[in-house]
From Swiss-Prot:
The gene is rimP. This is Ribosome maturation factor RimP. InterPro entries: Ribosome_maturation_RimP, RimP_C, RimP_C_sf, RimP_N, RimP_N_sf. PANTHER family: RIBOSOME MATURATION FACTOR RIMP. The keyword Cytoplasm applies. Pfam families: DUF150_C, RimP_N. It is found in: Cytoplasm. It comes from the Bacteria. One of its GO terms (cellular component) is cytosol.
């Protein structure tokens, strides 16, 4: 077994400032000492997502900082990536970053809601949901959300739906709020 790999906490402390200066936040660090070679995966996200160029830049910075650690005795693979589409939305920040995206939400009463993420406050998220042939905004208390996952879409959403979510046009949120 490879020894000398930093802990998750050490990686976050070492890289957190550098990532923050670049406008990103470390969401998670996964260290797999059993892989050959060992693997350190840093999951990062920002308000505008993490594109390939930003991931490459962060990876170079992270590699330089990690290489300075005296505790790493062996070769390792470093990966910097975004959380991915299947990451559950857990915090208000996650919902804010998913604004305009379609989500499936399981509520504490075991009901499910599918809608497009709109404005997110500290305690609630506005979901744009189907109301017959039209769209409506449903306020969901974040405390009632058991699970929320972004859905992959293969066709573009309706313009009215995007507008209610506050993306892609004029914001008519206040005009149509239930």
């Amino acid at each position: 077994m490879t020894t000398g790999l930093p802990s998750q906490t050490q990686v976050i402390e070492l890289l957190g400032g550098e990532f923050a200066r670049a406008g990103y936040e470390i969401e998670d660090v996964v260290i797999d000492a059993h892989a050959r070679p060992p693997r350190i995966t840093v999951i990062a996200d920002g308000d505008d997502g993490l594109d390939l160029d930003a991931a490459a830049t962060l990876s170079r910075s992270a590699s330089a900082l990690l290489d300075k650690l005296d505790t790493i005795e062996d070769h390792y693979v470093l990966e910097v990536s975004s959380p991915g589409v299947d990451r559950p939305l857990r915090t208000p920040k996650h919902f804010r970053r998913a604004r305009g995206r379609k989500v499936d939400v399981v509520l504490s009463d075991n009901s499910t809601v599918t809608g497009r993420v709109g404005e997110t406050g500290d305690d609630t998220v506005a979901l744009v949901v189907r109301a017959g042939r039209d769209w409506a905004i449903r306020e969901i208390p974040l405390g009632d959300v058991v699970k929320a996952v972004v859905q992959v879409e293969f066709s573009p959403p309706a313009q009215a739906e995007l507008e209610l979510a506050g993306v892609g046009g004029t914001d008519k949120t206040e005009e149509r709020r239930k």
